[in-house]
């Protein structure tokens, strides 16, 4: 939905709200836990800077810039300093082929996509001494370098491999649960335990 204007006309938008919109709104109004849902910011940035992609064209994931915009929402919920998305110094730093191109065996015929970095990111902000544990899907991989630059101690566990003992013994100061829409059923199962 971030780049919906690029979809073929034969694929109309059926619903303006999806499951994630509904769940985020529900959790924001029925819990005291900070719920970060950055769709509007990502969509706005995609429209303002169409040449600087936030998601890969041949991959189901956001790139490192989209991930940083998403992670900044978490930092803001923690009352931590961030920059506006346009203020980060972004540089191209290589190329990659996307997971969908690889699965479809089109990696040789589709052009490689640029990857980006924010040079000097670790020096932009003071290091935080708290420990951060991320339980998330593959999208969280893309923001871990930024998280590791901001915190003294941080680690990530995939939603398919962590154990529910985290409910009673989180082992961290900050627990981030990160899920994309495909994994909402897993998020619901985890939330039932809290």
Predicted segments with their positions:
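Extracellular glycan-modifying ectodomains
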Residues: 1-194
């Amino acid at each position: 939905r971030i780049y919906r204007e690029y979809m073929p006309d034969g694929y109309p938008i059926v619903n303006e709200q999806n499951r994630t919109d509904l769940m985020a709104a529900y959790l924001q109004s029925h819990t005291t836990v900070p719920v970060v849902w950055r769709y509007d910011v990502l969509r706005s940035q995609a429209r303002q800077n169409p040449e600087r992609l936030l998601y890969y064209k041949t991959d189901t994931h956001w790139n490192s810039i989209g991930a940083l915009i998403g992670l900044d929402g978490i930092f803001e919920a923690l009352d931590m300093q961030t920059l506006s998305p346009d203020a980060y110094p972004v540089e191209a730093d290589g190329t990659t082929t996307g997971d969908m191109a690889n699965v479809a065996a089109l990696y040789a015929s589709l052009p490689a996509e640029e990857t980006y970095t924010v040079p000097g990111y670790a020096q932009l902000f003071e290091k935080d001494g708290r420990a951060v544990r991320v339980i998330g899907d593959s999208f969280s991989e893309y923001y871990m370098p930024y998280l590791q630059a901001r915190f003294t101690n941080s680690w990530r566990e995939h939603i398919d491999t962590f154990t529910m003992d985290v409910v009673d013994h989180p082992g961290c100061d900050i627990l981030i649960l990160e899920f994309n829409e495909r994994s909402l059923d897993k998020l619901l199962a985890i939330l039932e335990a809290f």
